[in-house]
Curated annotation (Swiss-Prot):
InterPro entries: Dihydro-acid_dehy_C (IPR042096), DihydroxyA_deHydtase (IPR004404), DiOHA_6PGluconate_deHydtase_CS (IPR020558), ILV_EDD_C (IPR056740), ILV_EDD_N (IPR000581), IlvD/EDD_N (IPR037237). Keywords: 2Fe-2S, Amino-acid biosynthesis, Branched-chain amino acid biosynthesis, Iron, Iron-sulfur, Lyase, Magnesium, Metal-binding. It catalyses: (2R)-2,3-dihydroxy-3-methylbutanoate = 3-methyl-2-oxobutanoate + H2O; (2R,3R)-2,3-dihydroxy-3-methylpentanoate = (S)-3-methyl-2-oxopentanoate + H2O. The active site is at S517. This is Dihydroxy-acid dehydratase. Pathway: Amino-acid biosynthesis; L-isoleucine biosynthesis; L-isoleucine from 2-oxobutanoate: step 3/4; Amino-acid biosynthesis; L-valine biosynthesis; L-valine from pyruvate: step 3/4. Its EC number is 4.2.1.9. The gene is ilvD. The modification N6-carboxylysine is found at K124. It comes from Granulibacter bethesdensis (strain ATCC BAA-1260 / CGDNIH1). Belongs to the IlvD/Edd family. It is an enzyme of class 4 (lyase). Its cofactor is [2Fe-2S] cluster; Mg(2+).
Length: 618
């Protein structure tokens, strides 16, 4: 039987000093012996997805204490990828995931907390906390800040829904006036919450539902809606119950590793493929699986991508559909329900809120539930009022969207495509694999033959695209932007947005050892592994080389003889210290980023740190 960890600091004569310090935080005699629950918040005024979280930690804390626990709140950092985009700030985004995971580990282990509620929301915060939960393996419940409402404005005489990506695209499109660009800018992000499409933040919050670590609705109910408050309150009660089940009943199904098994990771990836989630989720699921000791690899993702259809298309893949529309269609539980009916889900896995995922679906899937309360929950609608206040409105749609033939969520009999929304490609350009969000690729370019136009940084590629260097038929290759080469594996949202604004979105491809924002669409292939900085073939590509991208057959290759590529490799290695480095790029890299680069693995392994790489150099 496991022992409450907190008793290390609260029991015994020799812990008088520690108890004295606990008392200084407000604990009383009756609190010693209760489970100490860490409330891991991520409030910051820098990020719209987190700006409303300030008081929500204490909301959860009050519920924990009402349920018989002791709550102690602390905060992590949170980077806004949209604000960090397009400049050297993006170098810090992915490495911040590791810092978040470490900071949670440090705080929880230093103070011997028994369990935790993770209040996350945006791109690297949910993954960082997820990695920490798997690493620590103490009871944990995730509750996110929720998606923002989609923006709306009149552009060129028509009312349209908007998000962050629209602001980027129209700003680079010279057919829009300054006034029209400003109208889009002012309307694109109207409320608090994570950006309104199926971008990385919302994708990850949805995946916590499939993993079994969050409550139904966590990925889809709006940040502004009063219904979201119930998730925070319930999380506080639930975590105390989970702690008691683990420490008093030795119930492994109350722990993250007991819940997030290999089958649960497959469920999460199947959901991601079905909903056309962000390609970044591949990195984060691989990383979390490693922390959990689960052997989940690119081979598993490739296998799943070949059998799971695309059942949902959300912005950026479908610009008029946002998370509020997914929620109206039954949210993540509805997508999981469709997968389960088709035999594409292991519903026997436990969750934090139900004995099994099957039990959860019986109540929460609108295709099978008889609960009017559940149906009312999924009618939660946007309020249409700009605000930074959580739970500030209670609007309802008149009905839920149950159309599984032409609605937002489709059945497996009526999918958007029989191939899923994500695919893994292999070939001489990416022997260890690379990722493409097929849900965002036009059918006309699923097979693409073009010529390489090579850039050794995102900045150079942006200049080339805006300067007219890139033409129809080009494959824009951006290299030395991987985890080691960047370092930090920048997102390439600006290059893909500018290709769209130049009318090249369906006429060009983009291939990189970097990654893409969840807001990216088009023939955008990232995570090329091995990356240029570790000797990957992408470092040997030259402008003018023929490139084949064949998504149906999962192939990406440089169509050159092996002897030509071998000669280039020999020439590269002859450069000595200058080998596998960008020849013309000037970039200041801080000691913090150099430390990350020294330890990180490539994208095929989740870009996690591997300390043995440093240890081997001693």
């Amino acid at each position: 039987m496991p022992q409450y960890r907190s008793r290390t600091t609260t029991h015994g004569r020799n812990m008088a000093g520690a108890r004295g310090l606990w008392r200084a935080t407000g604990m009383k005699d009756g609190d010693f012996g209760k489970p100490i629950i860490a409330v891991v918040n991520s409030f910051t005024q820098f990020v719209p997805g987190h700006v409303h979280l300030k008081d929500l930690g204490q909301l959860v804390a009050r519920e924990i204490e009402a349920a018989g626990g002791v709550a102690k709140e602390f905060n992590t950092i949170a980077v806004d990828d949209g604000i960090a985009m397009g400049h050297d700030g993006m170098l810090y985004s992915l490495p911040s995931r590791e810092l978040i995971a470490d900071s949670v580990e440090y705080m929880v282990n230093a103070h011997c907390a028994d369990a935790m509620v993770c209040i996350s929301n945006c791109d690297k915060i949910t993954p960082g906390m997820l990695m920490a939960a798997m690493r620590l393996n103490i009871p944990a419940v995730f509750v996110s800040g929720g998606p923002m409402e989609a923006g709306k404005t009149v552009v060129k005489g028509a009312t349209r829904a908007l998000d962050l990506v629209d602001a980027m695209v129209v700003a680079a499109d010279e057919s829009y006036t300054d006034e029209e660009v400003q109208a889009v800018e002012r309307s694109a992000c109207p409320t608090c919450g994570s950006c309104s499409g199926m971008f990385t933040a919302n994708s990850m919050n949805c995946l916590t539902e499939a993993l079994g670590l969050s409550l139904p609705g966590n990925g889809s109910v709006l940040a502004t809606h009063a219904d979201r408050e119930k998730l925070f309150r319930e999380a506080g009660h639930l975590i105390v119950d989970l702690a008691r089940r683990w420490y008093e009943q030795d119930d492994v199904s109350a722990t993250p590793r007991g819940i997030a098994t290999h089958a649960a990771f497959e469920n999460a990836m199947s959901l991601d493929i079905a909903m056309g989630g962000s390609t970044n989720t591949v990195l984060h699921l691989l990383a979390a699986a490693q922390e959990a000791g689960v052997d989940f690899t690119m081979a598993d993702i490739d296998r799943l991508s070949r059998r799971v259809p695309c059942l949902c298309k959300v912005a950026p893949a479908k610009s008029d559909v946002h998370m509020e529309d997914v929620h109206r269609a039954g949210g993540i539980m509805a997508i999981l329900g469709e997968l389960e009916r088709a035999g594409l889900l292991d519903a026997s896995r436990p969750t934090v809120h139900a004995p099994t995922l099957k039990d959860a679906l019986e109540r929460w899937d609108i295709g099978r539930t008889s609960s009017e309360e559940v149906r009312t929950f999924f009618r939660a609608a946007p309020g249409g009022v700009p605000t930074q206040v959580a739970f500030s409105q209670s609007a309802r749609w008149d009905s839920v969207d149950e159309d599984r033939q032409k609605g937002v969520i489709r059945s497996t009999e009526h999918p958007f495509s029989h191939d899923g929304g994500l695919a893994v490609l292999f070939g001489n350009l990416a022997p260890e694999g690379c990722i493409v969000k097929t849900a965002g690729v036009d059918e006309s370019i699923l097979t693409f033959r073009g010529t390489a136009r090579v850039y050794e940084s995102q900045d150079a590629a942006v200049s080339g695209i805006l300067g007219g260097q890139v033409v129809a038929g080009d494959v824009v290759v951006i290299r030395y932007e991987g985890p080691k080469g960047g370092p930090g594996m920048q997102e390439m949202l600006y290059p893909t947005s500018y290709l769209k604004s130049k009318g090249l979105g369906k006429l060009c491809a983009l291939v990189t050892d970097g990654r893409f924002s969840g807001g990216t669409s088009g023939l955008s292939i990232g995570h090329v592994s091995p990356e240029a900085a570790e000797g990957g073939l992408i470092a040997l590509v030259e402008t003018g080389d023929p490139v084949l991208i064949d998504i149906p057959n999962r192939i990406i290759s440089i169509a050159l003889p092996d002897e030509v590529l071998a000669a280039r490799r020999t020439a590269m290695e002859a450069k000595g210290e200058a080998a596998w480095k960008p020849a013309e790029r000037q970039r200041k890299v801080s000691p913090a980023l150099r430390a990350y680069a020294a330890m990180t693995t490539n994208a095929a392994r989740g870009a996690v740190r591997d300390v043995s790489q440093v240890e081997r150099k001693r």
